[in-house]
């Protein structure tokens, strides 16, 4: 092993060890850095359109962000917190309704066609429902512990706007200094890979965040207009669960349908819920995603499914939410690794 490899091995070991020791301290800095990264396009847009300095553009975006941040914590958070508390109290009622009212008629029709398949579907659905409600029950049982954690997060978030101000102000200088630390010989190649990752992340994360916010607004307003219980909570949940391909919308639709039945009974408003989801799904699939994100991720559906299960198995719920960008980054790294391998003497030399 050469001296360069030893140096980087020791450096990475010390860096990771040090990072793990100060994880709690570094959290607000990490979050502020991510927010600053997400806000950069808005800063560049303001800077070019108004023809002002980068620092002035950063100050304008910072004030806008701070205003939105303040409104969310003073208006939306108390409402959402109250609706979460109501939802947790009603979890047993939702489960009983699903198992006694929704599934029996469906399973009865399947039994009349194919009893063997119906038994398998029944057991699979039962296991799936029990898993979902076990998770929800666990959250309910630990609600007050999560409340204490929420208070700690609130205190943590008080620091974020302060740290964010300095990140926004000195962003270009920070990035330049970070680039200067890269090895001179391999710097162009590393920057090329980082640029590809940045393009992917900026396309997906910023695009997906915009889609989630638009859908959350749409569903929250639509649910409020038809008068369903927990309208704001269900709207935000539905809007952000689209991050999970395939399963996200189905889970939120099923939950909304149950709460809709408990709110209205068997009425035409259940049909309204279906229409709201149909419009939302069409809008997300055929308008928002193609226009905002497009095909820039370039992942095959099978690779997406594999990524969801793999990341979910390794990192839990958080892993599922970040499965697609992780898969995209992995794809970029693998393509570059294959390119390096094909340009190596090992690949080109005949054995």
Curated annotation (Swiss-Prot):
Superkingdom of this protein's organism: Bacteria
- Chief localisation class: membrane
State the Gene Ontology BP annotations.
transmembrane transport
UniProt keyword terms in alphabetical order? Cell membrane, Membrane, Transmembrane, Transmembrane helix, Transport
Q: How does it sit in the membrane?
A: Multi-pass membrane protein
- Give the transmembrane ranges: 6-26, 28-48, 60-80, 148-168, 217-237, 239-259, 260-280, 304-324
Family note:
Belongs to the autoinducer-2 exporter (AI-2E) (TC 2.A.86) family.
What this protein is called in its record is: Putative transport protein RP630
């Amino acid at each position: 092993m050469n001296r360069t490899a030893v140096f980087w091995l020791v450096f990475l070991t010390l860096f990771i060890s040090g990072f793990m020791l100060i994880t709690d301290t570094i959290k607000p800095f990490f979050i502020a850095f991510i927010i600053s990264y997400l806000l950069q396009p808005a800063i560049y847009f303001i800077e070019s359109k108004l023809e002002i300095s980068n620092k002035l553009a950063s100050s304008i975006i910072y004030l806008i962000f701070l205003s939105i941040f303040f409104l969310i914590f003073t208006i939306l958070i108390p409402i959402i917190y109250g609706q979460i508390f109501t939802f947790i109290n009603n979890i047993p009622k939702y489960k009983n309704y699903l198992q006694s009212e929704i599934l029996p008629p469906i399973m009865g029709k399947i039994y009349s066609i194919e009893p063997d398949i119906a038994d398998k579907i029944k057991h699979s659905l039962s296991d799936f429902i029990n898993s979902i409600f076990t998770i929800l029950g666990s959250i309910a049982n630990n609600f007050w512990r999560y409340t204490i954690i929420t208070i700690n997060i609130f205190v943590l978030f008080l620091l974020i706007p302060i740290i964010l101000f300095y990140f926004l102000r000195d962003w270009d200088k920070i990035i330049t200094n970070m680039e200067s630390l890269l090895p001179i010989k391999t710097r162009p190649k590393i920057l090329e890979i980082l640029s590809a990752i940045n393009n992917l992340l900026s396309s997906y994360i910023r695009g997906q965040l915009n889609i989630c916010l638009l859908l959350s607004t749409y569903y929250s307003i639509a649910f409020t207009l038809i008068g369903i219980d927990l309208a704001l909570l269900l709207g935000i949940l539905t809007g952000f669960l689209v991050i999970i391909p395939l399963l996200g919308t189905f889970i939120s639709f099923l939950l909304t349908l149950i709460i809709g039945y408990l709110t209205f009974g068997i009425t035409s408003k259940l049909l309204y819920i279906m229409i709201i989801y149909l419009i939302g799904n069409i809008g997300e699939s055929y308008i928002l995603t193609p226009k905002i994100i497009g095909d820039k991720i370039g992942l095959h559906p099978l690779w997406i499914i594999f990524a969801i299960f793999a990341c979910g198995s390794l990192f839990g719920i958080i892993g599922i939410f970040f499965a697609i960008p992780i898969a995209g980054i992995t794809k970029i790294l693998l393509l570059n690794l294959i390119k390096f391998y094909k340009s190596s003497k090992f690949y080109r030399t005949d054995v």
